């Protein structure tokens, strides 16, 4: 009737519009993002997997998945989402004992969950909030996991000298 045609002329529809889908990121943007993470991601995956070749398998699979999914996240969430996907890779969930020539032997000897927490901070460079989100933990639980990963000093406190040594070793490997 006349009411419907008036609504149509005014651009008013009886159904609300769906918001437009976010534009897909360009393949060049995704490639640049992955290139920017490459050194950190390789060290992370090799150390978490306990084996460089299994780490490489995880990186290749995650790059494909990330490239297909990146459009659903704002750019600011890409780092957190990338590390979350990497941690979910089967070859990083079922980890081996570290190889004798592990790049970060002190960290590589940790159990898989604390190893991932330490690597997210020292190698991936994530802050506590992003690292906790990548692991699906609260910030408090993430910080406890880091604390619990450290050996204790003679006073029973987490040994910050070990943390400093791990940080220095990670930095050396990233600068190679």
Q: Which residues fall in each region the model found?
A:
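Extreme N-terminal basic, low-complexity initiation segments
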Residues: 2-8
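Short amphipathic alpha-helical boundary/capping segments
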Residues: 101-111, 133, 138, 153
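Helix-turn-helix DNA-binding helix
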Residues: 55, 131, 142-143
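Short amphipathic alpha helix immediately N-terminal
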Residues: 109-130, 134
